[in-house]
Structures are given as C-alpha cells and as structure tokens.
Amino acid sequence: MAAGLITGSILFWTLRLGIGPTPTSRKVRAAIRDILPDNVSGHVMELGCGWGHLIPTLREKYPDKKIEVWERSPVPALFTEARYGIDVIRADFFKAAPGNAGLIVCYLYPGAMDRVERELIPQLPPGCWLLTHTFSLSNRVPVKTLRANDLYQTPVFLYQVQPA
C-alpha cells in the first residue's frame, strides 16, 4: 500500500512538473565538482534538488555559504531532508526572489530551462553563476562547458550573468 502511494506521488509530480526526480550520477557529479566556480558572492540555490545527490558536493565546495534547495515533489523532498539534514523549500522556484544568489544549480527539462532564461535570469545580480547539466540555455553562451566521463558524455554548462 505504502509503495503504491509513494509511486503514485512520484508519478503525479513527474507528470505535473515535466521531469522526474532523476539522481545525478557519480560521474556527472564529478564533472560538476570540477566546473564549479571558486568564488561565489551570494548564497547557493539548487532548483529541483530531487533526491539531494548534489548537496554534499555543494557543501564541500562552499562550506561557508547558505545552500537553499527547492523540490516540489514530496517524496524526494522528504528523503532529501532526512538524508542530508537540510530544509527543502517545497514551492515553485519561479516565484522565488533569488536577488542575492551567487550560484544557481539546476537540471531541468528544456521547457523549464527556457523559463529560467526568460523569468529567473533577469532577476539575478550581475556576476551570479548558473550551472546546468544535460540541457543548456538556448540564448546564452556558457563561460565553460565540460563533458562528464560517462556513457553519454553528459555536458555540464557554466554561465555567468553579465551586467545589463
């Protein structure tokens, strides 16, 4: 019974959000670790943290930074809170005020990446970093691109917001 409810919840939120809570593989996490910027001026936000697999990498790289994670699907959010001892914001991050963010990390489907570009990036301060993997931003050129050493050579993209 419980397994059915858990599966049903994950399926519901996958259909609603357009992407399931897919764990980031070890090899993609290694590429992310290698491309993360050393200097981040504000706090770190992970949009759509899923099962929380990037949290240890972000905590290790930025031990003095506030790390804010967002996930709307309840089952992965509860797992992440229990496993990593972090409060997960269970809200629509497109309604967030990321004003003093120094780094945004996200793995979202292409339609959501378009919304990030259209709605979220204009709110970010100049110099803020944006890291994505698998799916790039359509209208921006990354500062750096790295390919994971996995079967798919998964691309990891690093962007930086420029002054208007």
Where are these regions (language model features)?
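Glycine-rich SAM-binding Motif I of class I
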Residues: 52-56
